[in-house]
């Protein structure tokens, strides 16, 4: 069968798709990945075939403008909450109709439409009409995928990159909407998708918002309990092209700690919520070897202690198995890779998307710790947390338990037959096509 993956131009989101894309390709299926032109080179470096759609997204420039306009981190978080972009809310008393309506109003206008502009959707639909994929697998923020599937009749699945905030919030939204009078049931996401689909002569169904099914790489015990049908998937780390440095082949002389704030975070968000100076200061006095994946900009004006080795990039999939602990910002790639290798984690959450929820889950399962007051912590706080991870055996034991759970979850290769079956069940008549209004 033909399988089309779609994502907006964020390298970390595309990397989350690569293991499954390759599993399908090595099973004999034709695979393409569609994204904006600024991701094309990164896609082709994976050995997969890229399809350029829309104009360059220039995500880094967009985020820099947003950050410059909002100010410091506290102001950014406060502004996002006031704008209704807090999809992370879980407290029942806070999940009112006004809150969830505000979430979908702001997220649709500021996130979904910006990551998936009209031109991109047009191009994905045009390619899908021509190529006729049987299955479209889409990043949870890339609605061009389900729109193209609805227009062409392809089956479609949402592939998560972290916890299913969208699915959970959408269920809450629909439950609260049912309690409203018909004339008070605003639905910004549905309205946008209905208008978009109408341009191609297609109609909205709720599955366009959340997928016909979801492929979920989060360990089963850590998933949000959503009603959406899902296919469990073992997370397989993919770090892109890399050469393993010679020093990494040698066993560490002391307990090794990885300090990373994420490549995607520094490339896109142009800054770090955590103070790198405070992080390094906290580690300087400990009898450990630190490998810090920090670039020249992050290290500017800083004198590194003797026990800290700074490297611009090293694949975490090769580094973390040699580590006794990892300190990071809560990004999905680092979080999942550490779980896959059974490494205790200290999270300094950057408060983006699901990082605070992952931190809480990790601490609840006894597999790590996080800084509860991320804006007010000291070097001693960091040292105390890290020493607990290194000295208390329960953290490594609980990490090993989660790792066993992940190993027991079906791999990308294992789920290919199920995806073939689901595609056959959900794919519609290939004549189910529309045209953009005004086209002849």
Swiss-Prot record:
What is a GO molecular function of this protein?
Answer: hexosyltransferase activity
What family does the entry list? Belongs to the glycosyltransferase 28 family.
Keywords assigned: Antibiotic biosynthesis, Glycosyltransferase, Transferase
- Spell out the NCBIfam families in the cross-references: glycosyl_450act
**Lineage of the organism:** Bacteria, Bacillati, Actinomycetota, Actinomycetes, Kitasatosporales
Record-listed E.C. numbers: 2.4.1.327
What InterPro entries has UniProt attached to this entry? EryCIII-like_C, EryCIII-like_N, Glycosyl_450act, Glycosyltransferase_28, UDP_glucos_trans
Q: What is this protein called?
A: Aclacinomycin-T 2-deoxy-L-fucose transferase
Catalytic activity field: dTDP-2-deoxy-beta-L-fucose + aclacinomycin T = aclacinomycin S + dTDP + H(+)
What this protein is reported to do is described as:
Involved in the biosynthesis of the trisaccharide moiety characteristic of the antitumor drug aclacinomycins. In the first reaction, AknK catalyzes the transfer of 2-deoxy-beta-L-fucose from the activated donor dTDP-2-deoxy-beta-L-fucose to the mono-glycosylated aclacinomycin T (rhodosaminyl aklavinone), forming the di-glycosylated aclacinomycin S (L-2-deoxyfucosyl-L-rhodosaminyl aklavinone).
Q: Name one GO biological process term.
A: antibiotic biosynthetic process
Q: Identify the domain of life.
A: Bacteria
